[in-house]
């Protein structure tokens, strides 16, 4: 059975656990519509991605 040679210090234990924290997702404001969206994602309101129309937008009637 594997047994640790040395006691893990509180600092090292904390550094290992720092990756477990939940991080809030980042949002950017779209230049054209002003809507908040995730970076590198399509703007669902306009259907644009990187200045190109990639999605047909349904018009509300």
UniProtKB/Swiss-Prot annotation:
The gene is rpmF. PANTHER family: 50S RIBOSOMAL PROTEIN L32, LARGE RIBOSOMAL SUBUNIT PROTEIN BL32. Keywords: Ribonucleoprotein, Ribosomal protein. Residues 28-44 have a biased composition (Basic and acidic residues). InterPro entries: Ribosomal_bL32, Ribosomal_bL32_bact, Ribosomal_zn-bd. This is Large ribosomal subunit protein bL32. One of its GO terms (molecular function) is structural constituent of ribosome. One of its GO terms (cellular component) is large ribosomal subunit. Residues 1-44 are annotated as: Disordered.
């Amino acid at each position: 059975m594997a047994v640790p040679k040395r006691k893990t210090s509180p600092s090292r234990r904390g550094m290992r656990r720092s990756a477990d924290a939940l991080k809030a997702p980042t949002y950017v404001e779209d230049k054209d519509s002003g809507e908040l969206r995730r970076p590198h994602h399509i703007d669902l309101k306009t259907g644009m991605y990187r200045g190109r129309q990639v999605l047909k937008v349904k018009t509300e009637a």
